[in-house]
């Protein structure tokens, strides 16, 4: 409805969710038992009673599926670094079902990791961390240089403005529906936005104390890289499968059209 130009609200990006038929059919008490907390929160936020008027909603992404590579023991390619729950890729593929997040957190945290971490620790000898190693000094210098570079830009745009613009680009090009045209346009715009970020972002404060604006700027800088690789991956996967819906690959019934002959694999990108 939104894509067809029928959205509601100031930005024309919302739709109505009308419970009147369900209330008429099942009764308000039944709906209240099922959705009472949700309705109460909605009324508190909007000042509108969803039992009486349609709710105004907007579909939005919950998170991006996929994650860090882990082996059978849930250890990443960094020795000793275990990645559990939704942060890794192991228990889900191109789509998710309700409560999968809870399942993965319980399975990894309760059943797997207590055993695998113990086995790993039993084979190593704990020791003092040697911060005199050249790699430590190089990493510290890189982090400090990045902080100083962000603080030195002293531009005119806030970190949030870049974050919002990047989110809009990714949502429109690499959100619920994707197309070759949109993804190529995003892959042209994201590098431009990244250049604008590093030349015009304004980060108040200093790096000598806790600076949440600086912390946020570092995250948004990373988001620029993540957004680009997401769009590259979505463009490269020339099919529809799971939550990856390419509008060019649709059956006559409007369903996702897969291409298992060429894309029955998990993609891995190296940064």
Spans of features found by a protein language model:
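Accessory "access/gating" subregions that flank catalytic or transport cores
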Residues: 29-75
């Amino acid at each position: 409805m939104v894509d067809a130009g029928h959205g509601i609200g100031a930005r024309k990006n919302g739709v109505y969710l009308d419970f009147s038929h369900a209330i008429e059919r099942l009764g308000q008490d039944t709906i209240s038992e099922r959705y009472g907390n949700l309705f109460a929160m909605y009324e508190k936020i909007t000042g509108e009673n969803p039992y009486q008027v349609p709710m105004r909603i907007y579909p939005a992404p919950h998170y991006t599926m996929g994650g860090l590579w882990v082996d059978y023991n849930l250890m990443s390619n960094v020795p000793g670094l275990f990645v559990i729950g939704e942060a890794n890729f192991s228990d889900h593929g191109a789509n998710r079902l309700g409560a999968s997040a809870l399942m993965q957190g319980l399975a990894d945290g309760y059943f797997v990791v207590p055993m695998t971490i113990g086995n790993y620790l039993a084979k190593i000898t704990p020791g003092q961390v040697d911060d005199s190693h050249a790699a430590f000094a190089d990493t510290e210098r890189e982090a400090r240089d990045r902080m100083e570079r962000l603080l030195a830009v002293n531009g005119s745009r806030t970190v949030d403005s870049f974050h919002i613009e990047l989110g809009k680009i990714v949502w429109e090009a690499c959100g619920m529906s994707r197309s070759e045209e949109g993804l190529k346009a995003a892959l042209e715009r994201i590098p431009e936005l990244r250049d604008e970020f590093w030349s015009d972002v304004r980060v108040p404060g200093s790096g000598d104390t806790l600076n949440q604006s600086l912390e946020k700027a570092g995250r948004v800088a990373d988001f620029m890289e993540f957004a680009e690789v997401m769009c590259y991956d979505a463009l490269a996967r020339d099919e529809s499968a799971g939550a990856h819906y390419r509008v060019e690959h649709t059956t006559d019934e409007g369903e996702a059209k897969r291409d298992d002959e060429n894309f029955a694999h998990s993609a891995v990108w190296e940064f």
